[in-house]
Amino acid sequence: MLKIFTTQLTGIFSRIQDKESDAIEDGARLLAQAVISGHSIYLYGANELQGVFYEATESKEPFPSVKAFPENAEEVTESDRVLMFCSGTGTAEEQELAKELYEKGAGVVCVSPAAKDSAGIEQYCDVHIDSKLKMPLVPDEDGTRYGFPSLMTALYVYHALSFTLKEILQEYA
């Protein structure tokens, strides 16, 4: 089972690298605007994806200008940026939040699986990065699947954004 999980997860990471590199660069450029101008990057991740916030703030390589998403979205200004991580295509609440931020003019970078139709959260994002994780990775004998590593794929994209942002900021300095 571990071999299947590892193979499938490696495949997802490869697809993100191959197909989302432009979106990752666009997202990092949008986030760099907040860093360079002295504004905030608010990080949103519900449930298990709160782990991305802890990586961004408590690791040996903290993400610049990052803050926890506030209780009240009205605190986010149009000069701030928002980095949203969603394990699915966006709950109704997440889509409403993204829509509010998008309409306010705060730059929104969202990481989530792409929706099959246009009803996903990406419609309210300035930049959408497809996490490629649409279903659990390991098949069971009865046909069910398990092993849904949403935090692992979110952290992979987070680090890709972090590395790209660092390069952009070094070019700017």
UniProtKB/Swiss-Prot annotation:
**Which Gene Ontology MF annotations are present?**
carbohydrate derivative binding
Q: What Pfam families does the record tag this protein with?
A: DUF2529
Q: Could you give a single Gene Ontology term from the biological process aspect?
A: carbohydrate derivative metabolic process
| Origin superkingdom | Bacteria
| Cysteines paired by S-S bonds | none
The molecule here is called Uncharacterized protein YwjG
Task: Cite the source lineage.
Answer: Bacteria, Bacillati, Bacillota, Bacilli, Bacillales
Query: Which gene is the coding source of this polypeptide chain?
Result: ywjG
